[in-house]
Amino acid sequence: MFALADCNNFFASCERVFRPDLQGKPVIVLSNNDGCAVARSNEAKALGIKMGAPFFKIKHIVEKNNVAVFSGNMALYGDMSQRVRWVLEEFAPAVEVYSIDEAFLDLRGMENIDFDAYAKKISSECWRQTSIPVSVGIAPTKTLAKIASKLCKQYPKLRGGCYMHRPQDIEKVLRKFPIEDVWGIGRKSCAKLLSMGVKTAWDYTQLPENAVRKLLALPGVRTWRELRGEPCIEFEDGFEAKQSICVSRSFAKEITDMDELSEQIANFASSMAEKLRQQRSVACEMAVFAYTNRFKDNEPQTYGNSLVHFEQPSNDQRTIIASAVAAAHELYKKGYGYKKAGVVATHIMQESEVVHSLFEDSQAAEREHRITSALDAINGTFGRGTVKLAAQGSGRIKSSSEKQSPHYTTLWDDLPKVSVK
């Protein structure tokens, strides 16, 4: 058996932990620079606020209904996510963190257990220790466990836990479960299936396997088998290096100056290089992009994209920043206001897999490695950005997070204060 623990409306729930006065009231959390809604409480969803809705388009709903609005506080959310994971580790020998608000639990080998009660116990213990509401689904496969956890959110009477294992129960659920909500079925795959009359997860399981293989290849077959109760998706409780890394941001104020834009891109490149080094990998290519505000139809639009190919796969700070800045100068167009920019590392491989050229200057490479290691050590001790390259600028461009809550769990100065009379 596998369990999927999914934190309900996670970012909004984190804000409520330290603001109990918001229980039962509409809450939303905004993205970088307070651009759009990325988390909504059930009460906010009921008001018609959609995921990803630009804030300026829903501001009238917010003001009319007294919706509590927060800027994203990733330090808080990351810490609360870890606290939930610590609770989950009490219930299973292995936990696979799937995302900041989801984790799989490997329950194989656990016998003579009332899994329905176990799911509810996991949920109640997460609430008791963290005050985060968690929906726990248990089923024979990871895909079915995902569906079971969704049922918990739809039906409060399940009390946060659902054990789905009997064939007749699985069939009943799959007959009503929309194909577009099945884990592993992407937008394009969904469009193909709908055009064939496949509207539910049950419809999908009734297709012949060879037809699924022809239509959606091996990933589609895995999902098909998982829905039929056959575990096909491996449990991954160890670290897996990312195959692409993107660092991007929307700007609070549009950037029209080339130096300001290249400074921002240099900082994104620095962060990307750091992420590569953290997983001991290197990138063969890097994409650099910048574009204007697509919501301003009355202003000129441009989308700039430049692909950089490294002669030698790299995670070196100076090499990556220099290449990113050069690309920024190449794609910049005068007269446009850039709203968002970023960098993406692709074709990633492990450092140990790199084949070095006979003509490579090994001494220079070793010197660059020592410099980068020293930068990482200093910034790791005294904080990110303590030492940086000149191309990264002075940090004069700040993101807008006017509605951010305190860092309750990660900064001493932000600890909640209690008055005793």
Locations of the language-model features?
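Short, charged/polar surface micro-motifs in flexible loops or helix N-caps
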Residues: 10, 33-36, 293-296, 348-352
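Short Gly/Ser/Thr- and Asp/Glu-enriched loop/turn motifs at secondary-structure junctions
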Residues: 98-102, 139-142, 281-285, 336-340
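Short, hydrophobic beta-strand segments
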Residues: 103-109, 304-311, 355-360
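Short, charged/polar, Gly/Pro-enriched secondary-structure boundary elements
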Residues: 111-115, 297, 349-356
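DNA-contacting surface of Y-family translesion DNA polymerases
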Residues: 191-337, 353
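C-terminal hydrophobic structural anchor segments
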Residues: 325-381
